[in-house]
């Protein structure tokens, strides 16, 4: 089977760019890999493009927007998850701007897709009574207990 241009560039993106040049964490690799797996599933199920036929020309702004909508409508992804998937695709497009300059406009159109705002979780703090209760749980009749109380009290 002949390797498609998409497969060749995606492999290089992961092995040469992300791991070699950028030195990203294994968690980033895992997240980006999952994002592209979802994209391949979307293209197969919704657009009828199998992974072994996928070409760079298929990755357009419209396709990416439809993919992001599919994530939220079908997969019930939150805005934060949608933005995380978009970040993976944007990173790939940033890489592709230098690898495939004849499609520079295509990559820049995808890069112009905006992230959706999402509500950030507020940090809950312990109340004064909660702090007193927590500190009261530390046994102060031992050396380690007094040490622990001193450390936590700071």
Region roles according to the model:
Residues 1-154:
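Conserved catalytic core of the tyrosine transesterase superfamily
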């Amino acid at each position: 089977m002949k390797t498609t241009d998409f497969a060749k560039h995606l492999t290089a993106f992961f092995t040469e760019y992300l791991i070699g040049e950028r030195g990203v964490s294994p968690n980033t690799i895992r997240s980006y890999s999952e994002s592209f797996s979802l994209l391949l599933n979307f293209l197969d199920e919704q657009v009828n493009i199998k992974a072994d036929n996928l070409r760079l020309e298929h990755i357009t702004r419209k396709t990416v927007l439809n993919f992001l909508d599919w994530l939220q409508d079908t997969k019930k992804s939150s805005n934060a998850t949608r933005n995380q998937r978009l970040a993976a695709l944007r990173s790939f497009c940033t890489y592709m701007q230098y690898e495939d300059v004849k499609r520079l406009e295509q990559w820049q159109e995808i890069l112009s897709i905006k992230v959706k705002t999402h509500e950030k979780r507020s940090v809950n703090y312990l109340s004064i009574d909660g702090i007193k209760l927590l500190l009261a749980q530390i046994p102060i009749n031992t050396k380690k207990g007094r040490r622990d109380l001193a450390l936590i009290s700071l």
